[in-house]
Amino acid sequence: MCIRDRVNIERINVNSDPLEFSQTLSNIANDYAKKMYLEGFWCHKDPSNGNLVTERLLQVGYPPPQFIGENLAMASTIYSGHESLMGSESHRDTILDSEFKRIGIGIISGPNGLIIVQIFT
């Protein structure tokens, strides 16, 4: 089962609507996961330019979102990454937030496992 399906099952279980998949958000998430891997950092704020997820979206012409969230995880499998996010109150709150309507997911595999980036709008 893919991570998007796992997220939507969690949302349905708390009576939140499932999220619509966004390829644009996924491309942005994947690019950021790759950047963190290649440049060796782990942070919501890009150390090379100070950008947060909102700036990353606006830079590629994504319409300014009313609500935005981002989750980062490192894990050996998609399942363990999802479980790790659900085990963290702030990450779980982002996943379950009923204000969000769309999700994009980027996953990069490296020598130390997976880097997972989720973007919510």
Each model region followed by its residue ranges:
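Phosphate/diphosphate ligand-binding glycine-rich loop within oxidoreductases
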Residues: M1
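Functional surface patches built around histidine and acidic residues
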Residues: R4-T121
